[in-house]
Amino acid sequence: MEKKLSAMPYAQAKVRMLSGCYHNELISYQTTVAAIRDGWLHIYGLYSATTRRHIGAYVKEYANIDYQLAKKLYNDGMKYNIYTGEVAPI
């Protein structure tokens, strides 16, 4: 099942739900740019300014964090547990 981001319903981004709320992916244009798997948020790339806005809306809606933290996680090669707030290396 695919959903639009609540904050950006007209954007060229969608969230593909793979196993309920435990496993989903953010697809910006044609590229998977972030995912939550078993509660762990992974950011795969920051790409364009528009894609960064998509990532910001996704992490706010699904991980309850802001874009700046998501960017830091990506730059530091870390993943984030959306339930506990734990940060771990990828």
Predicted regions and their residues:
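Terminal leader/tail segments of proteins
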Residues: 1-90
